[in-house]
C-alpha cells in the first residue's frame, strides 16, 4: 500500500497542536475590533470573514458609517517596507484615476500594528466577477491593465520580489521534495517530471529573449477583479512584484487554443490603446502557467499549519492530488514546445 504524504499523516504527527500554536489562532474577533479602534474604526460587533487564505480579511460593520474591509497580513511574509511599497504603488494608480482599491490612511499612515499583527483598512467595494467570455469586457480590462503597467514602468520595486524561475519554480520544487510532501511511490516521478517542466520553462524564457520587466499586479485573475456597471476595479495587490507584462494578461484567458487566441486579441486591442505590448512575451504564457502550478502546490504545503488550509484544501497531499499534478506538468511540457499564441 503506498505511503501517505505528509499532509495525509498530519493528524498523527501532532497537527492539532501546531494549529493551536499558529499566530492566527490569536486573531480573535476581540483582537480585530480592538485593532480597528486604534485607527478610529469603531465596529458594531459584526464581522464577516472574506475569502482570503494568505491573509485574514474581514468586512467590518459600523453603526453610522459604511462598512470597511480590514486586512491582517500573514505574519513574517512581507517586511514593512514591502507592504508600504505595495500601498504606494496602489496609491499612485488611484491618483491617476485607475480603478483600484487603495488602503485608507490614518494620520498619514496606511500600515498599522496591534497585538503583533500588521493590518490595513480599505473602503468596501462591491461587484461581481467579470464575464471574461465577452469581448468588450476583455478590451476594457486590457485598457486598464495597460494604464496600470504604464505607471508600473515609471519606477521600480526595491523591496518586493521578482517573478523568476528560481523563486517561482526551483525553490518551490525543492521545498516539496525536501520536506516529505510526496507519497513515496510518486516522489521520483514528480522529481523527474517537474525537472523536465522547469527545463521547458527555461527554454521558453530563452526564446522570449531580453523582455522588459515592470511593477505588476502579479495575481490578476478574475477573482481579483470586481465588476460593476461602471466597469472593473482591481483589488488585492498583495502579490505585486516585478515581472513581464504578460503575467497580468494570461490568467484572463481560458479554453482551448483558439479561444485563448481570440481572448488575447480582445485584451490586446484594449491594451494597445494605451501601451505597446512586446509579442515576444507570448513565449512566456505556458511557462508562467507552469511556474504557477509548481508554486501553488508548495504554497499550500508551506502553510499547512494554518488551520484555514486543511479546511479549504482537504484533498491536498492525497495520491490522486499528486497524480493530477504530475499529469498537469506533463501536459505543460508539451504545451511549452508549441508555437506561442497568435494575435
Give names to the regions the model predicted.
Residues 62-157:
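ATP-binding pocket architecture of kinase catalytic cores
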Residues 16, 20, 180-181, 298-343:
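ATP/Mg2+ or Mg2+-diphosphate-binding catalytic cores
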Residues 75, 127, 232, 240-242, ...:
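Activation segment
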Residues 131-189, 211-213, 312-316:
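A cross-family kinase active-site recognition segment
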Residues 51-70, 103, 199-249, 253:
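Active-site acidic catalytic loop and adjacent metal/ATP-binding pocket
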Residues 2-105, 229, 341-343:
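Conserved NTP-binding catalytic cores of kinases and kinase-like/nucleotidyltransferase enzymes
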Amino acid at each position: 500500500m503506498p505511503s501517505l504524504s505528509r499532509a495525509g499523516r498530519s493528524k498523527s504527527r501532532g497537527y492539532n497542536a501546531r494549529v493551536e500554536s499558529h499566530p492566527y489562532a490569536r486573531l480573535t474577533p476581540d483582537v480585530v475590533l480592538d485593532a480597528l479602534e486604534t485607527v478610529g474604526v469603531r465596529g458594531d460587533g459584526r464581522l464577516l470573514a472574506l475569502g482570503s487564505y494568505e491573509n485574514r480579511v474581514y468586512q467590518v460593520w459600523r453603526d453610522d458609517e459604511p462598512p470597511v474591509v480590514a486586512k491582517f497580513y500573514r505574519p513574517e511574509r512581507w517586511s514593512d517596507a514591502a507592504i508600504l511599497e505595495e500601498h504606494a504603488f496602489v496609491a499612485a494608480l488611484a491618483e491617476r484615476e485607475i480603478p483600484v482599491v487603495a488602503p485608507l490612511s490614518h494620520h498619514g499612515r496606511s500600515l498599522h500594528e496591534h497585538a503583533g499583527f500588521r493590518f490595513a483598512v480599505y473602503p468596501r467595494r462591491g461587484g461581481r466577477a467579470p464575464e471574461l467570455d465577452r469581448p468588450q469586457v476583455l478590451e476594457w480590462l486590457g485598457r486598464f491593465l495597460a494604464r496600470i503597467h504604464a505607471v508600473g514602468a515609471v519606477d521600480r520595486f526595491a523591496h518586493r520580489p521578482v517573478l523568476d524561475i528560481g523563486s517561482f519554480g526551483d525553490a518551490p520544487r525543492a521545498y516539496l521534495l525536501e520536506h516529505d510532501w510526496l507519497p513515496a511511490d510518486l516522489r521520483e516521478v514528480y522529481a523527474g517530471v517537474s525537472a523536465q517542466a522547469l527545463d521547458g520553462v527555461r527554454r521558453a524564457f530563452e526564446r522570449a529573449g531580453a523582455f522588459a520587466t515592470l511593477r505588476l499586479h502579479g495575481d490578476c485573475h478574475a477573482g481579483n477583479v470586481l465588476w460593476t456597471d461602471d466597469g472593473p476595479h482591481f483589488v488585492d495587490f498583495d502579490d505585486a512584484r516585478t515581472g513581464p507584462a504578460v503575467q497580468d494578461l494570461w490568467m484572463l484567458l481560458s479554453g482551448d487554443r483558439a479561444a485563448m487566441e481570440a481572448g488575447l486579441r480582445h485584451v490586446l486591442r484594449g491594451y494597445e490603446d494605451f501601451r505597446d505590448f512586446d509579442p515576444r512575451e507570448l513565449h512566456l504564457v505556458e511557462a508562467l502557467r507552469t511556474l504557477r502550478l509548481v508554486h501553488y502546490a508548495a504554497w499550500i504545503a508551506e502553510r499547512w499549519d494554518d488551520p484555514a488550509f486543511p479546511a479549504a484544501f482537504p484533498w491536498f497531499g492525497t495520491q490522486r492530488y499528486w497524480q493530477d499534478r504530475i499529469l498537469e506538468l506533463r501536459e505543460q511540457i508539451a504545451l511549452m514546445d508549441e508555437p506561442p499564441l497568435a494575435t
